[in-house]
Amino acid sequence: MGEKAIDEDKVEAMKSSKTSLVFAINGQRFELELSSIDPSTTLVDFLRNKTPFKSVKLGCGEGGCGACVVLLSKYDPLLEKVDEFTISSCLTLLCSIDGCSITTSDGLGNSRVGFHAVHERIAGFHATQCGFCTPGMSVSMFSALLNADKSHPPPRSGFSNLTAVEAEKAVSGNLCRCTGYRPLVDACKSFAADVDIEDLGFNAFCKKGENRDEVLRRLPCYDHTSSHVCTFPEFLKKEIKNDMSLHSRKYRWSSPVSVSELQGLLEVENGLSVKLVAGNTSTGYYKEEKERKYERFIDIRKIPEFTMVRSDEKGVELGACVTISKAIEVLREEKNVSVLAKIATHMEKIANRFVRNTGTIGGNIMMAQRKQFPSDLATILVAAQATVKIMTSSSSQEQFTLEEFLQQPPLDAKSLLLSLEIPSWHSAKKNGSSEDSILLFETYRAAPRPLGNALAFLNAAFSAEVTEALDGIVVNDCQLVFGAYGTKHAHRAKKVEEFLTGKVISDEVLMEAISLLKDEIVPDKGTSNPGYRSSLAVTFLFEFFGSLTKKNAKTTNGWLNGGCKEIGFDQNVESLKPEAMLSSAQQIVENQEHSPVGKGITKAGACLQASGEAVYVDDIPAPENCLYGAFIYSTMPLARIKGIRFKQNRVPEGVLGIITYKDIPKGGQNIGTNGFFTSDLLFAEEVTHCAGQIIAFLVADSQKHADIAANLVVIDYDTKDLKPPILSLEEAVENFSLFEVPPPLRGYPVGDITKGMDEAEHKILGSKISFGSQYFFYMETQTALAVPDEDNCMVVYSSTQTPEFVHQTIAGCLGVPENNVRVITRRVGGGFGGKAVKSMPVAAACALAASKMQRPVRTYVNRKTDMITTGGRHPMKVTYSVGFKSNGKITALDVEVLLDAGLTEDISPLMPKGIQGALMKYDWGALSFNVKVCKTNTVSRTALRAPGDVQGSYIGEAIIEKVASYLSVDVDEIRKVNLHTYESLRLFHSAKAGEFSEYTLPLLWDRIDEFSGFNKRRKVVEEFNASNKWRKRGISRVPAVYAVNMRSTPGRVSVLGDGSIVVEVQGIEIGQGLWTKVKQMAAYSLGLIQCGTTSDELLKKIRVIQSDTLSMVQGSMTAGSTTSEASSEAVRICCDGLVERLLPVKTALVEQTGGPVTWDSLISQAYQQSINMSVSSKYMPDSTGEYLNYGIAASEVEVNVLTGETTILRTDIIYDCGKSLNPAVDLGQIEGAFVQGLGFFMLEEFLMNSDGLVVTDSTWTYKIPTVDTIPRQFNVEILNSGQHKNRVLSSKASGEPPLLLAASVHCAVRAAVKEARKQILSWNSNKQGTDMYFELPVPATMPIVKEFCGLDVVEKYLEWKIQQRKNV
């Protein structure tokens, strides 16, 4: 092992008692008296509230997103070794880092000392957008590099030993809602020694035509041996004490160093609430633990019995405090034991890397034993026949099998789980077994994310001892363990085990075993997707015995005949697993005509975002006497509010008051939103009208205390004499609960629908489509800070897309003139529409509380509250009738949409135009379109990226698919025959269609075949499907048409005395690169004066500053994908004014000097002449401010028929961006929008309970795309279409339209499922029971896909096999 001999006296000398914590953060020493620390304080709370290191962000508070990831370095003085790994600082308790060193992203490098290569490569690969997740990403990447280079021989110069596969996994636990992950992975891969930089995506370092050496010289330097980052300072090594033993009763945190000391503490604390602490990761799942007031915290990680590791011929024993990551490492060291390797591989899919690094095996098992946690570990270790050692309250040790332990009553508080032992599996035989017996072991899990970071729908682990006989494979013994399906613990299917023991495996035997299994593995009542989970149990059993036959292919009898060929598992080498490496290609043209506009320059502030120095609202230092707020919301859909009280009628710690509608000052109004159709209430008054409606705003002395206290609030309700709430669209229609849509916003007819239907040769009547909702999942939740100012004024810092409307809302709520309010927004950590209307009540509540208490008040809304109160995308139900010719040409379409607006209108009246606009991407002949906007007792829905358009576009695809199915014609032909001609495009879209040259969709349709090899790959897909039973592929290409509107936008450009330039716009930087495009436009426009300074040099002189509603008025909103170009145009107008003022000065200087004039001398002269060097403007689009965007995507997927898992093998996108203002920024928008669309179509299930309260309210229950769920090959071409005089330098929008193209994945999945259903039909002798047309729901989650492939597909297959044999 290379460990040094350890002198026992040395060990004893290191043991010491102490009364303070000593640790380092970014090399700085911190010492805190234990008596001054609340032991429940998390590391992220300390970092953000007590240190200047704000790069650590809070994204979820559950260990599920990675925004708070930091590097922890731990020194072992006995081994003189430093271990370094990432941790989730939102779960790690501050007291547990004693003697450790913490490195944050700004500790790796920053603008003062120089950025780290990780930061610079993230920036250069265009891998940051809103930037809120980027510091955590940076630390994850750095940790991967650090550990790869520590554990391998020195890498070649400039590179790391990190492999490309490891690079992908390095960020697999970090969530990003903006980028689509591809550039982040490429940035990390750029360090890998086995990657060619030229194979990576579009970046700032690699230019066409350059040789490899030139590119490498431009890459930010990385040298693992000379890094300026000191992750563990020397002073800490000198100070560190190996053990900390605290006996004093005055401290609430203790760290015993022996079991006896621990038991003594437990005995002394008899009757008090005690929390044993190791990794503390359980609080991410059991969040009520954070609210519980423990009187004593006992850190048990320094007790040798809990951290011991033993490996010998008996097996591997692991102390209960061994982390999951350490356990994986230990099991992998047992090179010749495949069972342990399989256990380790399965364990790598538990949680994510930074949770596994601190979460312990004992903690995981105890959660299963005490709280019925759906543990993977418990299941696989029961099957591995693991045993546990327990120390009872009487100090005696007992040993049980893990299975026995899990079945016992919950372990009492004074008994301890000491260790867990996995027996040796070196021998392939058991006592008394035949010499020819083979011992087999496999583990299984089905989860929405292949690489983990998601609970399993079902997990399982099987072991079997088998022998080969003349008539087949005999099962001598087996253990079949299932878990995570709603049972209390991992469950052995003993009836199935007993039945199989002694049996020769055959179709008939397996069918009977499956029948028994379905009776035995029954999900508990209330478990989600029970049928799917039961089906998975059958699948895993089937896969296990299928894999068994592959190992014993000599058998000639029964269903084992032919081994893997017959079963069909993985027989095609092209069948890709989700772990396949990502690859990509980009085809981009950088325009030089208006340089630097048109160039793919790095996003403004990208390195600041990566290092974590970019300031978001919650990063602003708290003003003196600052208070903190948390929302109290209703859990009932329609009820009178009788009272607000706390549990046990005891005011929680730190609470200063509760603000309700009664606290609105005289002259103020109870308004929470303003600026759209009607104003929403800030607080419910006498009656709450929906679950999730805000009732009050609790104010406390810290955010932690505010959040805890808000969860302890009890609302007393009364529903007597109230009508039942309206919770469905059908109830809304039945009760005429509808909002009026203004006539200009309603759907409109195109052509004569009656005539179109009469011309049809075929009709499909009354078909239906449904859509659920979607949550924004911006990484930064809603946040605001309100600071009272003199003369009854209020300054509010708001994370908003709509500063002007926030401003108006606050003024109206406080009853003050608008000039008393100032709203400032610098940047937003992701918006997607959710920081428009929904940001207003957050800022208004802070302002109201600040006004009442005359102290600053801020809030950072916790993730659960944010998910429950913000509404999300509009659910809808669609009914359509369509008429068409035999060649597939559609002649008429009638569409009726029921739209769930929720409680208030919000932006819902705008939705019909979006739905219809995107639907009209095809020529429907004649179109009748009508939308009913329904009022329900649910939280008001609002705009979410491509609102209405994404549903409208998909409605079109669903109709096309149904027509194709009806006619038994290739769906691609139906799409093609219904594409618009330019004439029909003008008919449907009027002036928005523009000129003939602007209609590029037919070009894209043909180009995608060449770009992606679409038609050739279709044939390959057909061949694959013909030769594979259990994996089916589908491929589909889908077009999109998206209408956008330009809005008036103000701007100001000021040149300061030193020649530096300040630009101000009211467009908000939310990650879309608005500041970057604005800077490019200013540099180009000012460069037209031609005074010896290039546009690129001018670019470095420009700073875009925060939005301020008193500095610039009439700012409207940042929405609709066009704010970047509108802001750029406003700035261009300003610059033109400045150039006009400067030209006479330049001319005079040239005449005076007779030589060239520099920029600095020109500005100096202008200042001497007192020329106004600040110009304001307001861009006002003319009547041609509307235009259409075009794109097309081809996606290929592979569906696992047995589990419902979908792997996106490849996506190719071609998007017409006009003449892109910045192709690097637009590429990021295209990829990010597409991946967010993937979430809507494939992953993100938005669920409510029977009262309309959102229950998918955490990272545990709501799954956005991750790096392992995006296309394995992801290619994008940005079409550089021609000049268009009515647009800003011929550019087009890119933020929202590409999201619609994610429907190509859904359509491809439908094609794959269709092939699976055809296969089932071929096994059915009477050809009944599986319709060829089906409406695949959105999202097509794993349970949905499996259901449509057939929950009983295994049984049908076996029945068919048995019948085939009988017929022979």
Swiss-Prot record:
Q: Name one GO cellular component term.
A: plastid
Cofactor names:
[2Fe-2S] cluster; FAD; Mo-molybdopterin
Q: What is its EC number?
A: 1.2.3.7
User: Where's the 2Fe-2S ferredoxin-type domain?
Assistant: 19-108
Gene Ontology terms: biological process:
abscisic acid biosynthetic process; auxin biosynthetic process
How cofactor binds (record note)? Binds 2 [2Fe-2S] clusters.
Describe the temperature dependence. Answer: Optimum temperature is 65 degrees Celsius.
Q: Name one GO molecular function term.
A: iron ion binding
Q: Which residues bind [2Fe-2S] cluster?
A: 60, 65, 68
Q: Which UniProt keywords apply?
A: 2Fe-2S, Abscisic acid biosynthesis, Auxin biosynthesis, Cytoplasm, FAD, Flavoprotein, Iron, Iron-sulfur, Metal-binding, Molybdenum, NAD, Oxidoreductase
For the keyword Metal-binding, the answer is yes
> How is the activity of this protein regulated?
Strongly inhibited by iodoacetate and potassium cyanide (KCN). Weakly inhibited by 2-mercaptoethanol, dithiothreitol (DTT), menadione, estradiol, 4'-(9-acridinylamino)methanesulfon-m-anisidine (mAMSA), allopurinol and tritonX-100. Not affected by p-chloromercuribenzoate.
pH dependence statement: Optimum pH is 8.
**Statement: the UniProt record of this protein carries the keyword Metal-binding:** yes
Q: Which reaction does it catalyse?
A: indole-3-acetaldehyde + O2 + H2O = (indol-3-yl)acetate + H2O2 + H(+)
* Family of the protein in this entry: Belongs to the xanthine dehydrogenase family.
Subunit structure comment from the entry: Aldehyde oxidases (AO) are homodimers and heterodimers of AO subunits. AO-alpha is an AAO1 homodimer; AO-beta is an AAO1-AAO2 heterodimer.
Entry function:
In higher plants aldehyde oxidases (AO) appear to be homo- and heterodimeric assemblies of AO subunits with probably different physiological functions. AO-alpha may be involved in the biosynthesis of auxin, and in biosynthesis of abscisic acid (ABA) in seeds. In vitro, AO-alpha uses heptaldehyde, protocatechualdehyde, benzaldehyde, indole-3-aldehyde (IAld), indole-3-acetaldehyde (IAAld), cinnamaldehyde and citral as substrates; AO-beta uses IAAld, IAld and naphtaldehyde as substrates.
Q: What is this protein called?
A: Indole-3-acetaldehyde oxidase
What is the originating organism of this protein?
A: Arabidopsis thaliana
